[in-house]
């Protein structure tokens, strides 16, 4: 969604924070948090656990820093073309806009009171493009409270939406996940035009890269039929997390005092959309950050000597293999140049850039690469 430059300048907000290398969205932590029964910091600092595990829970107890990170986030619908240049840059295959355009829904960050959208900030401490797909990067440090003021302004579908986080601590009223047997749980189905405030807590095991996404009531997109009526698309009934399929997702980046600064940070979401769920599409699309195929997906840039970090997340039904040509990084298994991601998992990659050239990054599942998951990575000296 284009934003007027004057509005962007007026709404600019700087953000500074530290970053940390972590693979798998906090997977180095051995703790699995128990269910939380209260909303206060004191309650969250006293999780219930078996006494044999009490030392692990104590190590992960939420200890408030006194900082509250406030975000004003809005869900918005907009017409989105995933292949705006009309071609597959690897094979030369052409596309027309009617084959690759759909009504998307995305999260955008605003100034207080949803007054105006924040300016894009692609720096290593920034919120990202703030264009809707993906949503803004929500940054915090261990000990911080994240307070998200969410408003649903999905004017096209007018569906209820929510925000569900991974990796942070919260109680049921701040979960954002809708259940049919508990349909009136606050924050799980925020109606069109309404708002809700979520409160999340960053404990030591929250350090890393995590997704957040819509987890509201299942819906289906209707399509025109031969008799002039509208019926559900080829997939039939309501689709779970269809808001996330349409673009309602983003990254949480949680750091601590050990997190090193970087020169470049790249945010990358691997996701897909199917004609079975989105009838306006001519065929399935495999996307990076809402775009499919080279020059529609992000082109990332770095210089030799830069400390580079990739924060990568995947949503949908598929497993992916992230690969960057000409580069390696260290994982718990050793040095690698490809790593597997499943649905709702994350990967944080960090290295010092030492290999100039015009490279590509892509999903190494051939079907996904041919479906659009490929982009450029340009390194200069």
Model region roles, listed by residue range:
Residues 8-12, 33-72:
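C-terminal segment of N-terminal export signals and the immediately downstream linker at the start
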Residues 80-253, 317-343, 362-365, 369-377:
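Histidine- and aromatic-enriched segments that form or immediately flank copper-ligand environments
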